[in-house]
Amino acid sequence: MEHSSNRPEDFPLNVFSVTPYTPSTADIQVSDDDKAGATLLFSGIFLGLVGITFTVMGWIKYQGVSHFEWTQLLGPILLSVGVTFILIAVCKFKMLSCQLCSDNEERVPDSDQTSGGQSFVFTGINQPITFHGATVVQYIPPPYGSQEPLGMNATYLQPMMNPCGLIPPSGAAAAAPSPPQYYTIYPQDNAAFVESEGFSPFVGTGYDRPDSDADQLEGTELEEEDCVCFSPPPYEEIYALPR
């Protein structure tokens, strides 16, 4: 007979450890700083190139020309402003940082992520379950070969009985999970059934009931036969007295 309900061992349970990455406020601040630093860096480079160009135009090629005198003053000013922007982008926003500084910065977010905890996802059941920041112990079900088969022999389920209905002293009957059957306790070849064949027990429809006198008579006869069956043999039959 097959069991309709599945036991918990029948469901394979899988556990996956997932480390979610949640963007923090520091990451958002770093992205804004990168934009500002990149803007200052490219602005400083552009102003520096323009300042160098004006300086060269005013002091080398156009000497003695009054129309280009303003370039001699504007060129160094733009060059100084461009260099200032580049220094601010490098020093404050760390646009051109060294490899050692970048490694140290990468280690700090890693430590923040590990301290936040992990997430565990359970699959193999009706609905996946996720635990955040919890300590989970994985349960491995036993192999299917170690389980007892569903179909067992009837000899292991029914205890062995003698004709009188006595259970042997062995532990086979104690290990039987089911109660004994009626025909094993009182078989058809029992003396109680053989000798009482002359009587008519419960013949007819299943709804007819015998009289109370017949019930009492049959009950007393069965009790006497049971006593005879369960009573030990007399001592004289086992050990004959010497004459």
Swiss-Prot record:
It holds the Pfam family TMEM174. Keywords: Cell membrane, Endoplasmic reticulum, Membrane, Transmembrane, Transmembrane helix. It is a multi-pass membrane protein. The keyword RNA-binding does not apply. GO terms for cellular component: apical plasma membrane; endoplasmic reticulum membrane. Kidney specific. Expressed in renal primary proximal tubule cells. GO terms for biological process: phosphate ion homeostasis. Disruption phenotype: Tmem174-deficient mice show markedly increased serum levels of Pi, FGF23, and PTH, resulting in vascular calcification. In addition, deficient mice exhibit reduced SLC34A1 responsiveness to FGF23 and PTH administration. Induction: Up-regulated by low-phosphate diet. The chain crosses the membrane at residues 40-60, 73-93. The keyword DNA repair does not apply. Disulfide bonds: none annotated. It is found in: Endoplasmic reticulum membrane; Apical cell membrane. Regulator of plasma phosphate homeostasis. Decreases serum inorganic phosphate (Pi) uptake by regulating the sodium-phosphate cotransporter SLC34A1 trafficking by PTH and FGF23 in the kidney. PANTHER family: TRANSMEMBRANE PROTEIN 174 (PTHR31020:SF1). Interacts with SLC34A1; regulates SLC34A1 internalization by PTH and FGF23. This is Transmembrane protein 174. It comes from Mus musculus (Mouse). The gene is Tmem174.
